[in-house]
Design a protein with these regions (language model features):
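Alpha-helical transmembrane segments and their immediate juxtamembrane cytosolic regions
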Residues: 1-362
Length: 362
């Protein structure tokens, strides 16, 4: 069955679901044990777990036809407000976690809270428990850069030159990202990484334009999944990895090669999931709620640490962020997804009750 005969946004939700599961895994223990076999699960998902979100954003991107400022305002609203709102909520939990002993720090003073709130409002940080906040910085900046390049190149009347200029400018921006990342140039809002990810947006954009209607047979998806998985494992075995927060991108060629292979790995996996309605329902649901999972999964990790300490009474250090006990990796993975979903449901219920209360007293 061809992809275009179903809702394409659902397929993208599946990809985002794969991505958010990978992010939760990546922020948990990097190495897990099955019997005597050690699996480098963290380094593996780090090869693609951010690139897939930028691919999805490029896929969902719609050309700016008229007003660039309207586009910029919409994107800022759609990314800035949700990230800011949930970051402030996560900040409120910090002193509670200090009291519980799951964070090794002193209580935030009024001055500290004021600084953190200011940083959150200005996109300079998401508070101590929101370790993934920088992702929203680079996603917002890269989309704004990509949209601006597309808008200005669209002013060229000749379609051939328009496309050439668009692709060349995106390539130049990506090259700046490679250079600044290799030189460890820490720009404001992590712009060095935003530059780096603009070409990934282009890949998603071009995929939707030219390949999204292509028919993928199950056999082809399975073969591609095995091939891409094997290549990624080969990179890991040879000590080649990607960790953008540490400026680790292997090399200019390898970064984009690995990103493309990782995206193909996720796309082939999503194509297989797409054939199973029950799996599609679950994974696409996670994709639609990826923002909340992104924000609250570390909060969930620390809840696991606290409960483990209380129930077992083991003398362990539970104050490390994002997690404290490597042996609890299965629980981190599960609760890192379930707890954020429960938090979202709780917050939605509070908002709904507040609205009903206001209507009742009007």
């Amino acid at each position: 069955m061809e992809l275009h005969s179903k809702n394409r946004e659902t397929f993208i939700d599946i990809l985002k679901g794969i991505g958010i599961i990978s992010i939760v895994i990546g922020h948990g223990p990097s190495y897990i044990w099955f019997g005597k076999v050690q699996i480098p699960i963290g380094p593996f998902v780090y090869l693609y777990h951010l690139a897939i979100f930028f691919f999805c954003s490029g896929y969902l991107y719609k050309d700016i036809q008229k007003d660039l400022t309207v586009f910029l305002a919409k994107k800022i609203k759609s990314l800035y407000w949700p990230a800011t709102k949930h970051s402030l909520i996560a900040l409120l939990l910090y002193n509670l976690y200090v009291k519980m002993g799951v964070v090794d720090s002193s209580y935030l003073s009024r001055d500290d809270v004021l600084i953190d709130i200011t940083n959150i409002l200005t996109l300079n940080g998401g508070g101590p428990l929101f370790v993934a906040y920088w992702f929203f910085q680079i996603l917002l900046c890269s989309i704004l850069i990509f949209g601006s390049v597309q808008y200005f190149s669209s002013k060229i009347s000749n379609i051939y030159y328009k496309n050439i200029v668009f692709i060349v400018l995106v390539g130049v921006i990506g090259r700046i990202g490679i250079y600044s990342t290799e030189k460890h140039l820490g720009f404001l809002y992590n712009l060095q990484i935003a530059y780096l990810m603009v070409p990934i947006l282009l890949i998603g954009y071009l995929y939707k334009k030219y390949m999204s209607k292509e028919k993928w047979e199950v056999d082809f998806s399975i073969i591609l999944l095995i091939i891409t998985f094997s290549i990624l494992v080969h990179f890991i075995k040879n000590g080649i990895g990607i960790e953008l927060s540490k400026y680790e991108i292997a090399s200019a060629v390898l970064f984009y090669l690995i990103s493309i292979i990782g995206i193909l790995f996720c796309v082939s996996l999503a194509q297989i999931i797409w054939k199973c309605n029950k799996l599609t329902t679950v994974i696409s649901y996670l994709g639609r709620n990826s923002l909340e999972i992104m924000i609250y999964h570390v909060v969930a990790f620390k809840m696991v640490d606290y409960l483990y300490f209380k129930l077992k009474g083991d003398v362990i250090n539970i104050s490390s962020i994002p997690y404290s006990c490597e042996s609890l990796w299965p629980i981190y993975y599960v609760m890192g997804i379930l707890v954020p979903l429960m938090i979202k449901k709780l917050l939605n219920s509070i908002v709904l009750l507040h609205k009903r209360r206001n209507r009742y007293f009007q």
